[in-house]
A protein has these predicted regions:
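C-terminal catalytic domains of large/alpha subunits in multi-subunit enzymes
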Residues: 1-115
Length: 115
């Protein structure tokens, strides 16, 4: 059987990864092609205390082709924060961003450019 608590935690983790991909995670490379960020001091991934509480609920349904009637959740939860956050920023300041991460500095510069 599917463990709902484990599934909920997996969904929370995927959402957190999607938020990190959208807002903080940036990798750069040196002239030899090696990552310049070689530790978590340099490569910022969000932690639970950076984001706050994520409330996850599931709708019961049965998928006859999935194991035990289950559906995949990994792709859904990691891919949905990007469009949600980028559209929220667009609705707030009227600027679209086409590269990740969308940093606070980029948002501030976009707001300043409109003034």
């Amino acid at each position: 059987p599917i463990n709902p608590n484990l599934t909920r935690v997996q969904a929370e983790g995927g959402i957190l990864q999607g938020i990190g991909m959208t807002l903080t995670e940036n990798i750069t490379y040196d002239k030899n092609g090696y990552p310049a960020e070689n530790s978590l001091f340099q490569y910022k991934i969000p932690a639970r205390n950076d984001i706050g509480h994520i409330h996850v609920e599931f709708e019961n349904s049965y998928e006859p082709n999935g194991p035990f009637g289950a559906k995949s959740i990994g792709e859904v939860v990691i891919n949905t924060p990007l469009p949600a956050i980028s559209d929220a920023i667009y609705n707030a300041i009227g600027t679209r961003f086409y590269e990740l991460p969308i940093t606070p500095e980029q948002i501030a510069m976009a707001v300043a450019a409109k003034q």
